[in-house]
């Protein structure tokens, strides 16, 4: 087969006309050094702070340092295959994570990739990991409670929806246990929970997930895990990723609860990244913006108004306010709350629950120090019945701790002081609670009522908890209607108070405890 010159030229013309050429203009640079997950890149002139960068082998990084002649970036994932001279491209995108109800019940990493072996997360939406917190105009005051089911917290340090309440204490004194009880108690309360594990052992995270599954809490919980074996970048990003996932529900008129366990590890990871990026160190070798690291995260937890939700959803959701409640955890060293990170987070949050190793070792669990634990806004959110009954408990405990210190040195105590000490011992005993056994509102109300009205005063201290349990069981079987009224109204009317008094007196006479 022979082609003449005219046919060849026609063929070439038709090929040229059919050619679709599109110019792919992308900013790219060259890797000049890789150390400890930090990459220095030359030639990336048009790059944003926090922009995703594409490395060879489908690996991504995050631009953090924008200098005159180079860019400092942190690698998200493995970096062993990246070497000097590799080409780096900009993506034009800020880091995003998947959001939506599809994530509920799943365990994901800091980038939203599933790590629970249950297949892909088919989330329809993604959202930026760094967002501006809602302004003052769009916020509402805290007025609805988050019931943790823990007697000492719900009575003395109440938490409201949209609040930031710090859980602070030394290692191994029950911080995670308090947070998990709060999640387990949200069953049937229309509250989505997000548990962010930062820098923990993989086995510890697995134990948490297993416990949440056993109690049925994974049905409304998302777990974001950046374990100790993950890179510092992943530990730094995990809280922001979890917060973005929680904001999805807040902005659509729903309520969410997020637990950061713990922010000390995030601060350590950020310090490591900053020092490797050659940023100037400050107090305790932390960078200058470590306060901003936590403030911009915790300010995103808020109760937003109906107008905000309506504007955000373009009128699809009306008349509903949303909230994101944050329970950050901070680990102290030898009870030192004056260290840099603890003082920062105490000043950002709306109160703190202070756990003490001495109380924990003395068998008072949860080991909450009632004297220094405080909730600055939660009182407005307390249920009526608990608010009525809890005032006396806090006073009794505070006076007991003060008197107990003096009583060690005094041999002859007057009757009033002795009475106060005895009451305090019983209240302290009453506030003990086993792990993973959160209480309902009526159960807390009954316990507080019994303590306030002196029904525990003539009991032996060792009998207090068995009396409380027996009383609850008795009310469940004989006074179900009274329980229902307290649960429905969240209040104790005059008639109900009379019925409760009679029930307690009858039970006490029976001696069935």
UniProtKB/Swiss-Prot annotation:
Q: Where in the cell is it found?
A: Cell inner membrane
HAMAP family for the chain: ATP_synth_alpha_bact
Q: Which InterPro entries match?
A: ATP_synth_asu-like_sf, ATP_synth_asu_C, ATP_synth_asu_C_sf, ATP_synth_F1_a_nt-bd_dom, ATP_synth_F1_asu, ATPase_a/bsu_AS, ATPase_F1/V1/A1_a/bsu_N, ATPase_F1/V1/A1_a/bsu_N_sf
Question: What function is annotated for this protein?
Answer: Produces ATP from ADP in the presence of a proton gradient across the membrane. The alpha chain is a regulatory subunit.
Q: Which reaction does it catalyse?
A: ATP + H2O + 4 H(+)(in) = ADP + phosphate + 5 H(+)(out)
- Entry keywords, A to Z: ATP synthesis, ATP-binding, Cell inner membrane, Cell membrane, CF(1), Hydrogen ion transport, Ion transport, Membrane, Nucleotide-binding, Translocase, Transport
Name by which UniProt lists this protein = ATP synthase subunit alpha
Q: How does this protein assemble?
A: F-type ATPases have 2 components, CF(1) - the catalytic core - and CF(0) - the membrane proton channel. CF(1) has five subunits: alpha(3), beta(3), gamma(1), delta(1), epsilon(1). CF(0) has three main subunits: a(1), b(2) and c(9-12). The alpha and beta chains form an alternating ring which encloses part of the gamma chain. CF(1) is attached to CF(0) by a central stalk formed by the gamma and epsilon chains, while a peripheral stalk is formed by the delta and b chains.
Q: Which PROSITE patterns does the protein's record reference?
A: ATPASE_ALPHA_BETA
User: Binding residues for ATP, per the UniProt record?
Assistant: 169-176
Annotated membrane topology is: Peripheral membrane protein
- Gene symbol of the encoding locus: atpA
Q: Does the keyword RNA-binding apply?
A: no
Gene Ontology molecular-function annotations: ADP binding; ATP binding; proton-transporting ATP synthase activity, rotational mechanism
NCBIfam families xrefs: atpA, PRK13343.1
Q: Can you list the GO cellular component terms from the UniProt entry? A: plasma membrane; proton-transporting ATP synthase complex
């Amino acid at each position: 087969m022979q082609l003449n010159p005219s046919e060849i030229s026609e063929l070439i013309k038709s090929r040229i006309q059919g050619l679709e050429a599109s110019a792919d203009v992308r900013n790219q640079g060259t890797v000049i050094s890789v150390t400890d997950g930090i990459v220095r890149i030359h030639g990336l002139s048009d790059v944003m702070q926090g922009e995703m960068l594409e490395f060879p082998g489908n690996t991504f990084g995050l631009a953090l340092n924008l200098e005159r002649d180079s860019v400092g970036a942190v690698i998200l994932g493995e970096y062993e295959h990246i070497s000097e001279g590799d080409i780096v491209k900009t993506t034009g995108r800020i880091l995003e994570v998947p959001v939506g109800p599809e994530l509920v019940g799943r365990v994901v990493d800091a980038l939203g990739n599933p790590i629970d072996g249950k297949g892909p997360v088919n989330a329809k939406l993604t959202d930026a990991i760094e967002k501006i917190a809602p302004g003052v105009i769009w916020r509402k005051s805290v007025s609805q409670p988050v019931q943790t089911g823990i007697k000492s917290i719900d009575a003395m340090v109440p938490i409201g929806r949209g609040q930031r309440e710090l859980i602070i204490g030394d290692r191994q004194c029950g911080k995670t246990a308090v947070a998990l009880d709060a999640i387990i108690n949200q069953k049937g309360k229309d509250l989505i929970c997000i548990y962010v594990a930062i820098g923990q052992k993989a086995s510890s995270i697995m134990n948490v997930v297993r416990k949440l599954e056993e109690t049925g809490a994974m049905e409304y919980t998302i777990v974001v895990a950046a374990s100790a074996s993950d890179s510092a970048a992943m530990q730094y990003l995990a809280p922001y990723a979890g917060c973005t996932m929680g904001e999805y529900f807040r902005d659509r008129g729903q309520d969410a609860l997020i637990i950061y366990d713990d922010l000390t590890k995030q601060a350590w990871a950020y310090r490591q990244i900053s020092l490797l990026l050659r940023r100037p160190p400050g107090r305790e070798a932390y960078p200058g913006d470590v306060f901003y690291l936590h403030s911009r995260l915790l300010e995103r937890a808020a109760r937003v108004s109906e107008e905000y939700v309506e504007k955000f959803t373009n009128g699809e959701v009306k008349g509903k306010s949303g909230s994101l409640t944050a329970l950050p955890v901070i680990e102290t060293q030898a009870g030192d709350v004056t260290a840099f990170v603890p003082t920062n987070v105490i000043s950002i949050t709306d109160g703190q629950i202070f756990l003490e190793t001495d109380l924990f070792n003395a068998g008072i669990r949860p080991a909450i120090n009632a004297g220094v634990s405080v909730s600055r806004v939660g009182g407005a959110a307390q249920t009526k019945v608990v608010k009525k009954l809890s005032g006396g408990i806090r006073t009794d405990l505070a006076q007991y701790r003060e008197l107990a210190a003096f009583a060690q040195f005094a041999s002859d105590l007057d009757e009033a002081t002795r009475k106060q000490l005895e009451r305090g011992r019983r209240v302290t005993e009453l506030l003990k609670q086993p792990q993973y056994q959160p209480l309902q509102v009526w159960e807390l109300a009954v316990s507080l009522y019994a303590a306030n009205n002196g029904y525990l005063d003539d009991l032996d201290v060792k009998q207090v908890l068995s009396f409380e349990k027996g009383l609850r069981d008795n009310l469940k079987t004989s006074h179900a209607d009274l329980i229902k009224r307290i649960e429905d109204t969240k209040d104790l009317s005059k008639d109900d108070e009379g019925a409760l008094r009679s029930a307690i007196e009858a039970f006490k006479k029976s001696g069935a405890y």
